[in-house]
């Protein structure tokens, strides 16, 4: 009886241990699930508040209220309001930059083999690709272009323009190395023309075009920009 009692205690202890471990795992899984759910609610509320009020006018208390949490709980997820804004727009920023860099590499490849015809085709393809990507992240670009005052992203368009200007200067170097005649534009001219280019693309977001309208307009814009670009460069 004594031995059986010991065995029963051991069995009971083992069962309790297993049960405790199971509950610990269950609590852990629940905690992870709750964290992820809360995180998503914060992102959703942040997106809604930023789109409605802009970054500067968005009140963190109202944002937390929309997510159903306290401000204390908010800081378990984000360091500050700026960190939340970054989380909402950074994937879109990085994605557009990656597509820009890939298109730039294709352009330089064509120039290096004197294939100017395909160079202009890349410009058209790139514009359409940009629109496709922008409309798959529409709210993020709306935040970038319309709601970013007070954030480090307020100069996003100028960053794209400056990148385009620098790559155009690199293109000039390659054209000269290849002995291809062209007309060189000044920095202010390049900035103005490239700013007009991106302003036209981003108009589709600022004025809430449908994706179909944006793509149709982009084809017209691509023909217009490409013809003008070739004309002013004498290519």
What residues fall within each predicted segment?
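Amphipathic alpha-helical packing segments from all-alpha helical-bundle domains
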Residues: 129-136, 150-177, 188-195
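Amphipathic alpha-helical segments that line or abut small-molecule/effector binding pockets
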Residues: 117-139, 191, 195, 199, ...
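Hydrophobic/aromatic-rich alpha-helical bundle segments in the mid-to-C-terminal region
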Residues: 143, 172-224, 233-234
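Alpha-helical structural segments
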Residues: 41-48, 52, 62, 66, ...
């Amino acid at each position: 009886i004594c031995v059986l009692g010991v065995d029963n205690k051991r069995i009971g202890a083992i069962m309790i241990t297993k049960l405790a471990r199971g509950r610990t795992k269950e609590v852990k899984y629940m905690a992870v699930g709750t964290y992820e759910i809360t995180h998503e609610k914060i992102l959703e509320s942040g997106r809604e508040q930023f789109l409605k009020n802009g970054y500067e006018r968005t009140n963190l208390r109202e944002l937390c209220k929309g997510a159903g949490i306290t401000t204390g709980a908010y800081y378990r997820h984000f360091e500050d309001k700026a960190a939340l804004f970054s989380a909402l727009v950074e994937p879109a920023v990085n994605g557009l930059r990656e597509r820009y860099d890939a298109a730039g590499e294709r352009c330089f490849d064509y120039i290096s083999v004197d294939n100017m015809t395909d160079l202009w085709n890349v410009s058209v393809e790139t514009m359409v690709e940009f629109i496709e990507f922008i409309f798959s992240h529409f709210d993020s670009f709306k935040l970038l272009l319309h709601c970013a005052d007070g954030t480090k992203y307020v100069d996003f368009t100028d960053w794209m323009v400056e990148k385009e200007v620098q790559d155009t200067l690199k293109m000039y170097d390659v054209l000269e190395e290849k002995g291809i005649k062209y007309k060189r534009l000044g920095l202010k001219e390049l900035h103005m023309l490239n700013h007009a280019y991106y302003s036209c693309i981003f108009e589709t977001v600022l004025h809430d075009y449908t994706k179909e309208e944006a793509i149709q307009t982009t084809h017209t814009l691509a023909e217009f920009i490409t013809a003008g670009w070739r004309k002013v460069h004498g290519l």
